[in-house]
Amino acid sequence: MLESFNTKSEMQYQRLTEEEKQKRGILGRLVGIIADFKNPTRNGRRYTEELWDKTFEDPIVKEKLDNRCILGELGHPADRQETDIEKVAICLAEMPKKGNDGKIHGVFDILDTPCGRILKTLCDYGCNIGVSSRGGGDTFEDYDGNETVDPSTYEFECYDAVLLPAVKAARPAYVTESFDTHKKTLKTALPNKPDKDV
């Protein structure tokens, strides 16, 4: 289960001293909201508290987190679920925490990679890029008529840095699912499932 804490802070960019950057091999950090389990995304899907608890209790996810291997790309890839190591920009730096407001808060390192440097440049410019989860799973309609991602089938891959996050609050002040106005494509849909039109 995710640890709880009491805060309503928004995602923020943390500048590091030159010494911290060299020691960590990173360009900066993103800290703030990464998911909302009380409200549907802009895509109309709900990612429940149960889904996120199960995700971060998974032994594979824990192993990847412990080894700093939950690596995210600059933008969601259009044609695959797995992460391309040559395109990584961020890394989930520690176990996310649940706020009392239904939001999950996380910390990401901006990596000193080509895509990480692009991301840092955008952040330095003032671009408030969001973060969005990537994974795969089935959906069902809940009792309120919301399309809900099934916690028992969801397979988490990572968080990516995106232009328009599906969770509106998932915007770092210095950087989960992209929102596509033309398709109801769940970036966390199984790769072999056909896209549904809006």
Where do the language-model regions lie?
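Polar/acidic, low-complexity leader/linker segments enriched in S/T/G and N/D
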Residues: 1-66
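Short amphipathic beta-strand and strand-loop transition segments with alternating hydrophobic
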Residues: 9-22, 87-99, 139
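Surface patches in mature domains of proteins
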Residues: 73-95
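Short conserved beta-strand and strand-loop elements enriched in small hydrophobics
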Residues: 60-81, 131
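Charge-rich (especially acidic), low-complexity segments
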Residues: 195-198
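Short, charged/polar surface micro-motifs in flexible loops or helix N-caps
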Residues: 40, 78-79, 111-114
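Residue microenvironments linked to proteolytic maturation
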Residues: 92-193
